[in-house]
Amino acid sequence: MSRIGKKPVVIPSGVTISVAAGNKVEVKGAKATLSKTFSTDVTFSVADNVATITPNNNSKNAIAQSGTARAILSNMVEGVSKGFERKLKIIGVGYRAKAQGNELNLTLGFSHPVVYKLPQGITAETPAPTEIILKGADKELLGKVASEIREYRKPEPYKGKGVRYEDEYVAKKEAKKK
């Protein structure tokens, strides 16, 4: 059986988990409320501030789904209690970002500024024009938004210009010699 799927998810105080028909799980906390529909191959049980996920049968898929469901549920619990944060750095002459409400204005060397509309549940702040901090309760959505922003101008391998994650290492190439 999946080793991750065997571990119970500890529910901190202030967080409630409810399981509805069709494996629809709703997690409520101080920061947000998240809901997700999981595979019918797993069963959820919540008791004494601990949630456990068990596969319905011993098929390979059900066992794999139990580990996946446990990891997602753990991220949902952490997201509604603490929240998640992703930092992006912008490197390049004239490359800037500015957060305005639920929009992010990016100047990335195109002939026009790029306006990225943030989805509900994600907030952005720009402490410096070359730094973006994305915050949200949904880890999956936060990663998707960060990836979409990075996609506008990926770091190039010669000078390293572009949008990158804060902890990302960009391998640099040497310029062609004549």
Curated annotation (Swiss-Prot):
GO terms for molecular function: rRNA binding; structural constituent of ribosome. Keywords: Ribonucleoprotein, Ribosomal protein, RNA-binding, rRNA-binding. The keyword RNA-binding applies. GO terms for biological process: cytoplasmic translation. PROSITE patterns: RIBOSOMAL_L6_1. One of its GO terms (cellular component) is cytosolic large ribosomal subunit. This protein binds to the 23S rRNA, and is important in its secondary structure. It is located near the subunit interface in the base of the L7/L12 stalk, and near the tRNA binding site of the peptidyltransferase center. Part of the 50S ribosomal subunit. Belongs to the universal ribosomal protein uL6 family. HAMAP family: Ribosomal_uL6_B. This is Large ribosomal subunit protein uL6. It comes from Francisella tularensis subsp. novicida (strain U112).
